[in-house]
Amino acid sequence: MTKLFIPYIMGNKDLIENATLLSENGADIIEIGVPFSDPVADGPVIMEAGQQAIKQGITIDYIFEQLEKHGNQIKCQYVLMTYYNIICHYGEQAFFEKCRDTGVYGLIIPDLPFELSQRLKQQFSHYGVKIISLVAMTTDDKRIKDIVSYAEGFIYTVTMNATTGQNGAFHPELKRKIESIKAIANVPVVAGFGIRSPQHVADIKEVADGIVIGSEIVKRFKSNTREEIIKYLQSIQQTLNN
């Protein structure tokens, strides 16, 4: 099976242009970050991009409006990465309805406890918007079983610990953990931690069904030319499916 390539971008004024470029250069699913004032799960690069977007006046309304008008330019599925506070403030039902109407495939909600995600699934599954499960590598096995048994779309494995050694290879324990999750999962299991280079991709693709690249993509959209970004995306894509 081909491996999933899931790049992350911050929802900003270049949202549609950046997402279109990614979708034309190998992205299978694009994660669109919704800027938030207190992004507890974000690293420094994404946090800074979020602050910039807030300064530009970017809101969830702006993102929905752009997706409504121009989402058809994005040639692959896209998910929103948002904190629960934004959904709560918008109104849960209205939010899910708007996601459905703007073609959003799913939601990644990093601060959402498993129990609350279950309630949202029960209440709003008829909108067809998937709630993507996050599994931290520190989560105990029983909890993982519970999360995985209700997973939809794909499972996003994350970790807060240092994940790459001196040689840039991923810790064997992480790989074992991904394999144990895959053994009980009915959806793809993707890795989303510290992946920056084709070398990282080559290492982690042995076990994962796909990869998420966040900070590195955000960094490149900030400082690279369009041509350089395309070249980077091609190198990731080739490594992933070679």
Curated annotation (Swiss-Prot):
Coiled-coil blocks: none
Residues the record marks as active site: E31 (proton acceptor), D42 (proton acceptor)
Keyword Amino-acid biosynthesis attributed: yes
Gene Ontology cellular-component terms listed: cytosol
Enzyme Commission numbers on file: 4.2.1.20
GO molecular function: tryptophan synthase activity
Pathway where this protein functions: Amino-acid biosynthesis; L-tryptophan biosynthesis; L-tryptophan from chorismate: step 5/5
InterPro entries for this protein: Aldolase_TIM, RibuloseP-bd_barrel, Trp_synthase_alpha_AS, Trp_synthase_suA
Chemical reaction(s) catalysed: (1S,2R)-1-C-(indol-3-yl)glycerol 3-phosphate + L-serine = D-glyceraldehyde 3-phosphate + L-tryptophan + H2O
Keyword annotations from UniProtKB, A to Z: Amino-acid biosynthesis, Aromatic amino acid biosynthesis, Lyase, Tryptophan biosynthesis
Its biological purpose: The alpha subunit is responsible for the aldol cleavage of indoleglycerol phosphate to indole and glyceraldehyde 3-phosphate.
Subunit (UniProt): Tetramer of two alpha and two beta chains.
Family: Belongs to the TrpA family.
Protein name: Tryptophan synthase alpha chain
Native species: Staphylococcus aureus (strain MRSA252)
